[in-house]
A protein has these predicted regions:
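Hydrophobic alpha-helical transmembrane segments that constitute the membrane-spanning cores
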Residues: 61-64, 144-173, 206, 214, ...
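Membrane-interfacial helix-loop-helix connectors in multipass membrane proteins
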Residues: 72-95, 163-205, 214-235, 254-264
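Active-site cofactor/substrate anionic-group-binding motifs, chiefly glycine-
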Residues: 46-102, 106
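Hydrophobic alpha-helical transmembrane segments of multi-pass membrane transport proteins
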Residues: 86-129, 214
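Short, membrane-interfacial amphipathic segments enriched in basic
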Residues: 1-41, 218-223
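Short cytoplasmic-facing helical segments at TM-TM junctions of multi-pass membrane proteins
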Residues: 119-144, 225-229
Length: 264
C-alpha cells in the first residue's frame, strides 16, 4: 500500500514542482522586464530568430491549411446546397482556431526546441555559472529578450498565417472548386468580424508566453551533458505542444463568452 501511494504521489509532486518552477521563472522574467534595462541587441536578434526566420514555415502551414480546409468544407456543405457558405466557415475557423493553434505548434517545434537546446547547452557547459560570476543575471540576459521577442512576434506570425490561409482558401474555392466568387466573399465578409481576429491574436499572445517559458525552463533545468540537453529539448517541444492544445480549449470557452461567434 505504501508503495502504491508513493508511486502515485511522486509524479503528482513532480508535476506541481514543475508548475512552481514555471511560475517562479515567469514572475522573475516579468519583474526583470519592468526593473531592468532591455538589452536591445539580444531582443532584436531574437525577433529575427523567432519572427523573421519562421516566415516560411508559417506561410506554408497557413496556405495548405486554408486550402485543404476550404476543399473539405465545400465537399461536405455542397451536399446540402450550402457550398457558398464555405468562405464564412473557412475564415472564421482560421481566425479563431486553426491559425493560432497550428502556428503555435510550428513555432514550438522550431523555436521552442532551439531555445531549450541553446540554453541547455549553456547550462551543462557552465556558461550560465560564468554569467553569474560576471554579475550578469541569467534571467535578464537569456529569458527576457526571448520572452519579449516571442510576445511581439507570435501575434504577427498568427496574423500572417490567418491572411495566407484565407487567401489560399479563396484561391481553391474560386479557381479549383468553381464556387461563385460573389457569394463566397459576401458570406465571408458577413460572418467574419473584428472579434474573430482579436480572439485569434489573443490566443497567439498566450501561446507565445507558454512556449517561451516552458522552453526556457527546460533549458535551465538541463543536466547530464549532451543526453540531458537532448532530453530537455524533446520535453520542451512535447510540453509546449500539449500546453498549447490544453490552453486552447480553456481560452476558446472563455473568449467565446467575451467574443461570441456568429453574425451579431
Amino acid at each position: 500500500m505504501v508503495r502504491f501511494f508513493n508511486a502515485l504521489g511522486t509524479p503528482v509532486l513532480a508535476f506541481f514542482q514543475y508548475l512552481g518552477e514555471l511560475v517562479l521563472l515567469a514572475g522573475d522574467t516579468f519583474r526583470s522586464i519592468f526593473t531592468h534595462k532591455l538589452r536591445w541587441k539580444l531582443f532584436l536578434n531574437q525577433v529575427v530568430e523567432i519572427g523573421l526566420l519562421s516566415q516560411l514555415v508559417v506561410v506554408i502551414t497557413g496556405a495548405f491549411t486554408g486550402a485543404v480546409f476550404a476543399a473539405q468544407t465545400f465537399f461536405q456543405f455542397n451536399k446540402i446546397g450550402m457550398g457558398s457558405a464555405t468562405g464564412a466557415v473557412v475564415s472564421v475557423s482560421i481566425c479563431r482556431e486553426l491559425g493560432p493553434v497550428l502556428t503555435a505548434l510550428m513555432v514550438a517545434g522550431r523555436v521552442g526546441a532551439a531555445m531549450s537546446a541553446e540554453i541547455g547547452t549553456m547550462k551543462v557547459t557552465e556558461q550560465i555559472d560564468a554569467l553569474r560570476a560576471l554579475a550578469v543575471y541569467p534571467t535578464d540576459y537569456l529569458v527576457v529578450p526571448r520572452a519579449l521577442a516571442m510576445m511581439v512576434s507570435m501575434p504577427l506570425l498568427v496574423a500572417e498565417c490567418i491572411a495566407v490561409g484565407i487567401a489560399a482558401g479563396y484561391f481553391v474555392a474560386i479557381f479549383m472548386l468553381e464556387i461563385n466568387g460573389t457569394y463566397y466573399m459576401a458570406n465571408m465578409v458577413r460572418w467574419t468580424r473584428n472579434r474573430d481576429i482579436i480572439m485569434g491574436l489573443s490566443k497567439a499572445f498566450c501561446f507565445g508566453v507558454l512556449i517561451v517559458f516552458i522552453s526556457c525552463q527546460k533549458g535551465l533545468a538541463a543536466r547530464e551533458g549532451a543526453v540531458g540537453v537532448g532530453r530537455a529539448t524533446t520535453e520542451a517541444v512535447v510540453n509546449s505542444s500539449l500546453a498549447v492544445l490544453i490552453c486552447n480549449f480553456f481560452l476558446t470557452m472563455l473568449l467565446n463568452i467575451i467574443y461570441p461567434a456568429g453574425y451579431q
